[in-house]
Amino acid sequence: MLAALVAGAADADAASATAGSGAAATPDRARYDVTLRSDADGAHWTGRERVSFRNASAEPLREVYLRLWGNGEDPCGTSGAPSPVVVSHVVGGTPGPLTVDCTALRIVLPEPLARGERTSVAFDVSLTVPDRNARFGREGASRFLGNALPVLAVHDAKGWHLDPYVALGESFYALASDFRVRLDHPSALKVPATGRTRTLPGAPGRTVTVSVADRVRDFAWAAGPFRTATRTTPGGVLVRSFWAADTPAAGVELTRTDAVASIDRFGQEFGRYPYGELDVVMTPEFGGGMEYPGLVLIGTTEEGGAVVHEVAHQWWYGIVGNDEYSSPWLDESFAQYANFRFQGWDTNDCWSDVYWPDDNATLTASMAYWSQQRGQYHLVYTAGPCALADLERTLGADTMARLLKEYARDHWYGVSTTEDFVRAAQSMTDVDLGPFWEAHRIR
């Protein structure tokens, strides 16, 4: 995400969870089968979602949690304005009350799920797009459905990850999963989405957009009377562009050009883009940009937008995953470092320009910290890439390039941590990098 950094943040206190003895992240190998139907303008979607999953932990899995991130801005709503995301008619388990400001739903399984076994839960889902310009929101006739679809929470050695929603950045932590999604909508609406998409005729005046997405961490889509164009990159990636009619034409062209160039370049630097298709959605007033697997939302002016940063997120968060609440620098700083290099910006002295609010502040702080220091959150986008640029100068450009490509390979579709990266970097040199990490507040 690259935003104006002026949004308000939700509560910073993470929900407590008891750590279990089974360290493997679970439930894993999830598959989501979703069928939704929209109203006339794409602002309301209803249907059914089924998710099957495996227990990867050594411990029996007795429950799962759904994250209803779309409720994050509105928590539990009011009697006159209920929460935007509603789950009902659950089968395959017994639902409890909503918790964590109505962003978490516990479902107790009928019997403990042993290691390696699979089961599924299914439920009705209702999504009402909020009246705000945001990743789950709207702008004019455009509808954005980012983080709208309920997804499984993750349990690992730290317990269940039930962190609060933050508007300032991201709270999201998900394992790579498969999605099969059918979106039934008026034919006047174009519906870009995560995955490889195709359209089928529906009822009179309606179209069904069908998407298949494998090994992705989330599923997002947009809907609107978009103008469209497609390009295939020299590397073979289909880039589909969608833009609102009032988006500046010059900015649209710049954004499309940068999307095509950056996805191929990052494929060479970090590993070939595996999803085949990227949808780029542009509107004139969207705040900055927001990344999802195979889909980016870009606020686009005459000068273009933050598309290069968001394309870089396809690797740093999408392919190489991380817990975005506990370690936001692992995706934001890495994506911005890739952006700096793509743009050719001079980073020789940028670390010396960094101002830290206090001696204890660290680049590797969690969103619990940044939510309380909103004016300093820009450091993830400024100090972070500067630190990585300094690491490049310390290791040498060729070694840094090899580090990132091998690091991406070793964590492809997995989850990375700061400790993983520190170990990987140290393995590339005989020089003790301890003083480097300390000086750059990577702790």
Give names to the regions the model predicted:
Residues 171-308, 337:
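Hydrophobic helix-coil surface modules that form long, contiguous segments used
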Residues 80-141:
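A surface-exposed beta-strand-loop module
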Residues 62-95, 146-149, 184, 188-189:
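Solvent-exposed beta-hairpin/edge-strand motifs
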Residues 1-46:
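N-terminal, polar/Ser/Thr-rich
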Residues 282, 293-352, 404:
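Zinc-dependent metallopeptidase catalytic helix centered on the HExxH motif
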Residues 326-397, 405, 411-412, 428, ...:
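Acidic/His/Gly-enriched intrinsically disordered linker/tail segments
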Residues 69, 121-220:
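Extended, low-hydrophobicity, Ser/Thr/Pro/Gly-biased non-transmembrane segments
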Residues 37-41, 412-443:
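Beta/coil-rich, acidic/histidine-enriched accessory regions frequently appended to metallopeptidases
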